[in-house]
Regions:
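Solenoid-like repeat scaffolds
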Residues: 112-113, 150-157
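Residue-level recognition of tetratricopeptide repeat
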Residues: 72, 117-119, 158-160
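Short coil/linker segments at helix-helix boundaries
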Residues: 2-109, 121-151, 167-173, 177-191
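Long amphipathic all-alpha helical oligomerization modules
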Residues: 157-165, 169-170
C-alpha cells in the first residue's frame, strides 16, 4: 500500500501537475493512472484493516466503533493517504469527494493512537486535509493549519521538510503570499 501511494504521489501525480498546462490530455491520462494506483492501494488498505476488524466499513460510515491499537497505525495512515490520493487524482469526481470525511476520521484516529508517529506525519497530513474543508473561513482555516503545522514541527523537532512544504503549498501559495512561500522553501533548502 505504501509503495503504491508513494509512487502515485511522487512520480505520477508530479508528472501530471507538470504537464497540465502543456499537454492537458496527457496530464489527464496521468491523473487517471494515478487514480488507478491509489484505488488499488485504498482497496488493499480497507481489506487489510477489515480482516482484523470486520466492522471497519461500518466504522468508516460511523455505524460502529472500533478500538484501534498501535499495531494499526501504519495501515490507518496509508489508507488515509490513499483515499486522499483517490480524491486528488479524480480531479473533482463527486464519487471520490464523498470519501473526504473518511480521510479526516482516519487521520484523527491516528493522532489519538500516537500523535508523534513518524515525526508527526498525521499532523502534516492534517494540514492538507484541513485546507479541503469548505466549512472553515480564512481565520479558522489558518488557525487550524497553524495548529497542525506547529504540532508536526514539534514532533519532528523541526527536522522534517514535509510540514514546511505542505504549509507553503496549502496556505502561502493559494493566498498569494510570495515572500512567506519563498521563505519556507528557502528554510527547507537550508535544513
Amino acid at each position: 500500500m505504501r509503495t503504491k501511494v508513494e509512487y502515485g504521489f511522487g512520480i505520477i501525480m508530479e508528472q501530471a501537475s507538470r504537464l497540465i498546462d502543456k499537454d492537458y490530455s496527457l496530464a489527464m491520462t496521468k491523473y487517471e493512472q494515478a487514480n488507478k494506483i491509489f484505488s488499488e492501494a485504498r482497496d488493499s488498505g480497507i481489506s487489510i484493516i477489515s480482516k482484523k476488524y470486520p466492522n471497519f466499513k461500518k466504522w468508516l460510515n460511523k455505524e460502529a466503533s472500533i478500538d484501534f491499537n498501535a499495531d494499526d497505525i501504519s495501515d490507518i495512515y496509508w489508507l488515509a493517504v490513499s483515499i486522499g490520493g483517490c480524491i486528488s487524482s479524480s480531479r473533482g469526481n463527486p464519487f471520490e469527494l464523498i470519501n473526504l470525511p473518511n480521510v479526516g476520521r482516519l487521520l484523527r484516529t491516528g493522532i489519538d493512537i500516537n500523535p508523534g508517529w513518524e515525526n508527526g506525519s498525521f499532523y502534516s497530513a492534517m494540514i492538507s486535509f484541513t485546507t479541503t474543508r469548505s466549512d472553515l473561513n480564512e481565520v479558522m482555516l489558518r488557525d487550524s493549519v497553524d495548529y497542525y503545522f506547529d504540532k508536526a514541527v514539534l514532533y519532528s523537532d523541526g527536522k522534517d521538510a514535509g510540514p514546511y512544504l505542505t504549509y507553503a503549498e496549502s496556505i502561502h501559495k493559494p493566498f498569494q503570499e510570495r515572500k512567506n512561500f519563498v521563505d519556507k522553501l528557502n528554510y527547507v533548502i537550508n535544513m
